[in-house]
């Protein structure tokens, strides 16, 4: 196996893991970074593998919580509420994705759309953070979330179907806008990532499994492990960060990154294939 290809697969896995749970759009980063380093492996199969690695990082980090929920479903009120909330939050984006996913990929999966959504998302984060600085959050614990709160987060997640929006960004900011405390919204976004990404991965596997070859196994394992490790680091670091600070630095980063994408695209450094 060529060392340079291995290095590129490792770097792509790290990018996925580090960006999946930050409100900065992992999709935008993967496309730009993949273009810049010239990574052209079996794209969809590799993408499935690194997404699965990232989501397993959340499962591992919250393994005790998920274990308690699995053992408590049907018997424990908190566990039942937790599962119900995840199901409610899952439905809007799942339904809209099935109905309009193909059209969105055809018409919005381009540099301009991603760049615009990165910039608009950055401005939205600035506004939400300013609003929460004077509006006291009503909910400060995941177990205190009501079904209506989960529904509002689920509705916000629909916007993440547009490339460049960021799934974590839309759910966290949607939760904060609804009156949920920053860290609580972040944790629920992590939990919601599990059913969303598992469902998306399963759907993609059914569509693309025939493109899998034994030749891809090595690169897939490298990307998977890299995404898992970097995802675990990102989850832990983000929780520590939002316990003391806000998301404003990520807002400015999004704006700069969005402008950079347009510059790179116009200059011919990246393509969208």
Swiss-Prot record:
Function: Catalyzes the dephosphorylation of undecaprenyl diphosphate (UPP). Confers resistance to bacitracin.
Assigned keywords, A-Z: Antibiotic resistance, Cell inner membrane, Cell membrane, Cell shape, Cell wall biogenesis/degradation, Hydrolase, Membrane, Peptidoglycan synthesis, Transmembrane, Transmembrane helix
Major subcellular site: membrane
Annotated Gene Ontology cellular component terms: plasma membrane
Entry's transmembrane regions: 13-35, 45-62, 82-102, 108-128, 144-164, 186-206, 219-239, 250-270
Name of the featured protein: Undecaprenyl-diphosphatase
GO BP: cell wall organization; peptidoglycan biosynthetic process; regulation of cell shape; response to antibiotic
Membrane topology, record value: Multi-pass membrane protein
GO molecular function annotations of the record: undecaprenyl-diphosphatase activity
EC number: 3.6.1.27
Species of origin: Neisseria meningitidis serogroup C (strain 053442)
Class of the enzyme per the UniProt entry, highest EC level: hydrolase
Pfam families: BacA
Cross-referenced PANTHER family: UNDECAPRENYL-DIPHOSPHATASE
Similarity field: Belongs to the UppP family.
Miscellaneous section: Bacitracin is thought to be involved in the inhibition of peptidoglycan synthesis by sequestering undecaprenyl diphosphate, thereby reducing the pool of lipid carrier available.
Gene: uppP
Catalytic activity: di-trans,octa-cis-undecaprenyl diphosphate + H2O = di-trans,octa-cis-undecaprenyl phosphate + phosphate + H(+)
Localization annotation: Cell inner membrane
């Amino acid at each position: 196996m060529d060392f340079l290809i291995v290095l590129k697969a490792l770097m792509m896995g790290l990018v996925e893991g580090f960006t999946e749970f930050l409100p900065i759009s992992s999709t935008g980063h993967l496309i730009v970074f993949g273009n810049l380093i010239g990574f052209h492996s079996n794209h969809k199969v590799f993408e499935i593998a690194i997404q699965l690695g990232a989501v397993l990082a959340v499962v591992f980090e919250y393994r005790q919580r998920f274990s308690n929920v699995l053992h408590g479903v049907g018997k424990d009120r908190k566990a039942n509420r937790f599962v119900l909330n995840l199901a409610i939050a899952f439905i809007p984006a799942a339904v809209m994705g099935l109905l309009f996913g193909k059209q969105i990929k055809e018409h919005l999966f381009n540099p301009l759309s991603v760049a615009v959504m990165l910039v608009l998302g950055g401005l939205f984060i600035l506004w939400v953070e300013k609003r929460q600085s004077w509006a006291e959050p009503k909910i400060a614990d995941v177990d205190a979330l009501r079904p209506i709160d989960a529904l509002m987060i689920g509705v916000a997640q629909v916007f993440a179907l547009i490339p460049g929006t960021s799934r974590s960004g839309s759910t966290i900011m949607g939760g904060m806008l609804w009156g949920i405390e920053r860290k609580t919204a972040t944790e629920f976004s992590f939990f919601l990532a599990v059913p969303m990404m598992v469902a998306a991965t399963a759907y993609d596997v059914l569509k693309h499994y025939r493109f899998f070859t034994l030749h891809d196994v090595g690169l897939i394992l490298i990307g998977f492990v890299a995404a898992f490790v970097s995802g675990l680091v990102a989850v832990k670091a983000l929780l520590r960060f939002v316990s003391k600070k806000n998301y404003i630095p990520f807002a400015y980063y999004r704006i700069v990154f969005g402008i950079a994408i347009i510059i790179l695209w116009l200059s011919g450094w990246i393509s969208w294939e």
